[in-house]
């Protein structure tokens, strides 16, 4: 599978806001499972041990249906990158791929659709079931193009955008798309008002 990811933003400023938001525990569980599957149980133990105590208490044993703070998720992901010796951006994309594979084959398999545009439209409508900040809207641009806009997100991070890119790439591939390209044409991390993901596949 070929993936292409380009950030097409007008500023090199990369900022983040971590406090106040929550994500579903299924995301945390998928990221820990990624470490276990790729690097083994010892790497999971080292990752959890590298976290601040309050983050460890939140992510260790989290349920798929429960909520985890956005800040704890980002701290977990950065601990994974350090422990596994990976560059953060590349690892976040890979975590996004893995999360899509795991969640769409298990707890969220009922959300899969024959039509990828239908999946993204439904996903935008269900946004608040997976994170409690921001709103998402989906626009079908052509049979093989789409656009996702994320508005009013009080929490954001370059790491999360990279993970979202990987997730979108894998979702499109799971639904049969080839030669997937994701372009982030605007981003709150670069002082833009919204995050915009341009999707293209064959």
Over which residues does each language-model region extend?
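Amphipathic interaction/junction segments at domain boundaries or subunit interfaces
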Residues: 4, 62-163, 186
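Long, highly charged amphipathic alpha-helices
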Residues: 30, 46, 75, 122, ...
């Amino acid at each position: 599978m070929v993936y292409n990811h380009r950030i097409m933003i007008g500023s090199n400023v990369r900022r983040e806001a971590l406090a106040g938001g929550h994500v579903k525990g299924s995301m945390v569980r998928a990221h820990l499972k990624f470490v276990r599957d790729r690097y083994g149980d010892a790497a999971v133990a080292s990752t959890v041990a590298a976290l601040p105590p309050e983050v460890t208490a939140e992510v260790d044993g989290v349920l798929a249906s429960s909520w985890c703070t956005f800040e704890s998720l980002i701290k977990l992901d950065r601990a994974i990158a350090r422990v596994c010796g990976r560059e953060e951006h590349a690892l976040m994309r890979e975590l996004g791929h893995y999360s899509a594979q795991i969640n769409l084959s298990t707890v969220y398999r009922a959300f899969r659709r024959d039509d990828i545009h239908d999946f993204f439209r439904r996903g935008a409508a269900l946004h608040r079931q997976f994170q409690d900040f921001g709103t998402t809207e989906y626009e079908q641009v052509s049979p093989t193009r789409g656009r996702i806009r994320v508005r009013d997100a009080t929490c954001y991070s370059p790491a999360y955008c990279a993970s979202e890119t990987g997730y979108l790439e894998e979702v499109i591939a799971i639904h049969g798309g080839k030669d997937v390209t994701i372009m982030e044409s605007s981003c709150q991390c670069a002082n833009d008002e919204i995050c915009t993901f341009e999707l293209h596949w064959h």
